[in-house]
Amino acid sequence: MRVLITGTSSGIGKAIAEKFLKEGFDVTGFDRKEASISQDSYTHFCLDIRDREQYPALAPFDIVINNAGVQNENDIDINLKGTIAITEAYGIHDAIRAVLMIGSASGHTGAEFPEYTASKGGVLAYTKNVALRIAPYGGTCNSLDFGGVLTELNLPVTEDQKLWDQIMDLTPLKRWMTVEETADWAYFMTVTNRFCTGQNILI
């Protein structure tokens, strides 16, 4: 099967791509940065998901995973509008198996910066919209809304001992997720799962 994943050059997106490659899938990655994966079954395109004119014409994908995201002045344009643009271009067709959004706990809790929270909240609503539209094709659409994940992006948090201790006091398992665990969830929701759809899963 063919999988499209955005934001594959680092962090969660890279881990998801590596998981699907390990399982024998053909993976296409979109990222503004150069490829950090070198495998025969991996194809990489350097592009900005905000610019639809950069989107390549590609054969239909079985699975589309929207992972690309930022936390800056481009929150709405990338996290929400970019996710919508990618999905509309590659995820809405009669052979689609699954569309997955990588959301955020902030979309549920309202924490973080206003624009970021709004962008992720929009993704939660759009997930339900897509689920209804691809259900007639047997496709599913869900979002995985992670809290703390051990990525380079979160180093300012994990390396601040006082802040980290405060977070761990509120965390029952006393740790954050690894990127490999996020990849396992992504694989389960798009490959193993064939019935759950339209759900925003807070982890």
Please identify what each model-predicted range represents:
Residues S9, A17:
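N-terminal Rossmann NAD(P)H-binding glycine-rich loop of SDR-like oxidoreductase domains
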Residues E18, I84, G121-K128, L132, ...:
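Conserved active-site helix of classical SDR/Rossmann-fold NAD(P)-dependent CH-OH oxidoreductases
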Residues N67-N72:
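Conserved NAD(P)H cofactor-binding loop of Rossmann-fold oxidoreductase domains
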Residues A98-G122, T127-P136, G148-V149:
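Catalytic loop of short-chain dehydrogenase/reductase
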Residues A135, T140, C196-Q199:
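Short, small/polar-rich loop/turn modules that mediate ligand/substrate recognition or access, typified
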Residues D145-P156:
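Short, flexible catalytic-loop segment of classical short-chain dehydrogenase/reductase
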Residues R175-I203:
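C-terminal substrate-recognition "lid" of short-chain dehydrogenase/reductases
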